[in-house]
């Protein structure tokens, strides 16, 4: 409250209103009148009257979008891998002076509960590109780690690589990415599966009244798997 103000017309401006990582909308009213949007209010100071200028600031967290993409290559079909692969998106925030972990759900909200995002339930598969995609909107700006927590397929070795916003490919199952205000942060993972292999050695001994040449022309072998597939020399 400012007293002894000379009579006349005044402009009242809120010059500092921004807070890091927050979006703000400012409204004002003069003498209880209709609310207006803006940071500057025009008001008249009249004799023996009190002119009231009321400002209201509404703050919301700045948010961006996190787009996760998964490509599966090698000796595992996308259908086989879909039931195996899960991800966690995690960040650290300060609450009451202490750093605590928060997880991101498919709706973009932060939760105290460890949350897993699954290829089968949360991602969408594009048959043309062969990629799984999850778009998480309304993610509060900040630093996040995206970890592929389950990736192993029985009988296979797997190599995991990732890239952020189309950058260089890195080896590993955990990517660190920054979500910025109004932008889409793209994190692409690729799993390349290779079946475990060994060596099968066959030996054949020929005895009796037959020559090696005769046996070579007559003897043949087949090797089949449990599901009836044939194995070649390679």
Give, region by region, the residue ranges found by the protein language model.
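Solvent-exposed loop/turn and edge beta-strand elements of beta-rich ligand-binding domains
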Residues: 1-234
């Amino acid at each position: 409250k400012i007293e002894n103000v000379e009579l006349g017309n005044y402009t009242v401006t809120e010059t500092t209103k921004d807070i890091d990582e927050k979006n703000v909308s400012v409204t004002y009213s003069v003498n209880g009148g209709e609310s207006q949007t803006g940071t500057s209010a025009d008001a008249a100071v009249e004799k023996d009257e009190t002119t009231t200028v009321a400002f209201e600031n509404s703050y919301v967290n700045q948010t961006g979008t996190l787009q996760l993409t998964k490509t599966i290559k090698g000796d595992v079909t996308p259908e086989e891998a879909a039931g195996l692969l899960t991800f966690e998106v995690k960040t650290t925030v300060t609450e009451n002076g202490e750093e605590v972990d928060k997880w991101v759900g498919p709706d973009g909200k932060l939760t105290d509960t460890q949350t897993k995002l699954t290829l089968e339930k949360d991602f969408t598969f594009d048959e043309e590109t062969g990629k799984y995609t999850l778009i998480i909107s309304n993610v509060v700006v900040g630093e996040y780690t995206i970890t592929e927590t389950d990736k192993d397929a029985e009988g296979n070795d797997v190599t995991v690589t990732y890239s952020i916003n189309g950058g260089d490919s890195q080896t590993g199952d955990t990517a660190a990415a920054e979500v910025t205000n109004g932008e889409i942060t793209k994190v692409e993972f690729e799993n390349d599966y290779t079946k475990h292999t060994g060596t099968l050695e066959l030996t054949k001994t020929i005895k009796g009244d037959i020559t090696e040449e005769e046996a070579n022309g007559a003897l043949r072998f087949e090797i089949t798997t449990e599901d009836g597939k044939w194995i070649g020399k390679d």
